[in-house]
């Protein structure tokens, strides 16, 4: 897919799905700005992706003023992909951790969308958010993550309506079980991994590139009449 000269922002771009998405845009010819939560993450990603046109910057999406300053400072944008997020299994049952997860995953997404609106309007751009299979069902050990991703799904639909008058499309992907650092413990648990693969009609774990390609589609002219969609990318896990 050719996206030459597209101006793209990917938050949470220093690892996992976000890093693959940033790489995919750069390989398609886009000019990519990627963010990471810490300077160490940014340094690692910068070194690993030195051969690509991706410029990484530290950004805490929980800091409203920092998000506004950074995103508005980018000027006009064609695409914003919100991947920044956290998950704190078991700990999210405590109110403080629950609130932090909501703030990063849901409020952080809204902060980036709001800050980017004028820049996207200038180029009739689009937003792709990162929801989850847990947008559709509960997680007993991850109430904050599940609630935040359910919120991202509804935020996506709501902003698709609100931003349509500006010519901005807003969609989301909802990844299933993807092989990333966040799921490494489950991948390394033979019993649990077998259960996941057994329920997935496609019969395997997803890879980050399996998510990156649908994101590129949603951001491309091929999806010019697509907005408000929360697209499962889960190998069929949700239909079982």
Predicted regions and their residues:
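Short C-terminal tail/terminal secondary-structure segment
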Residues: 137, 215-216, 227-240
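Short, small/polar-rich loop/turn modules that mediate ligand/substrate recognition or access, typified
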Residues: 164, 169, 226-228
């Amino acid at each position: 897919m050719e996206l030459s000269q597209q101006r793209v922002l990917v938050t949470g771009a220093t690892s996992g799905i976000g890093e693959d998405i940033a790489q995919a845009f750069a390989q398609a010819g886009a000019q990519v700005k990627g963010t990471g939560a810490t300077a160490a993450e940014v340094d690692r990603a910068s070194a690993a992706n030195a051969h690509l046109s991706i410029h990484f910057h530290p950004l805490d999406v929980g800091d409203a003023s920092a998000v506004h300053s950074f995103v508005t400072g980018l000027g006009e944008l064609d695409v914003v992909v919100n991947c920044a997020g956290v998950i704190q299994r078991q700990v999210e049952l405590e109110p403080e951790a629950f609130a932090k997860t909501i703030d990063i995953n849901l409020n952080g997404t809204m902060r980036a969308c709001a800050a980017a609106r004028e820049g996207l309007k200038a180029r009739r751009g689009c937003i792709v958010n990162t929801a989850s299979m847990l947008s559709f069902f509960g997680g007993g050990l991850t109430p904050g993550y599940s609630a935040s991703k359910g919120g991202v799904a509804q935020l996506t639909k709501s902003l698709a309506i609100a931003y349509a008058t500006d010519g901005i499309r807003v969609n989301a992907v909802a990844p299933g079980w993807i092989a990333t650092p966040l799921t490494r413990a489950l991948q390394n648990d033979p019993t649990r991994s077998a259960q996941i693969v057994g329920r997935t009609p496609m019969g395997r774990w997803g890879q980050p590139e399996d998510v990156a390609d649908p994101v590129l589609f949603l951001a491309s002219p091929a999806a010019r009449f697509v907005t408000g969609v929360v697209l499962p990318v889960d190998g069929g896990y949700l239909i079982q």
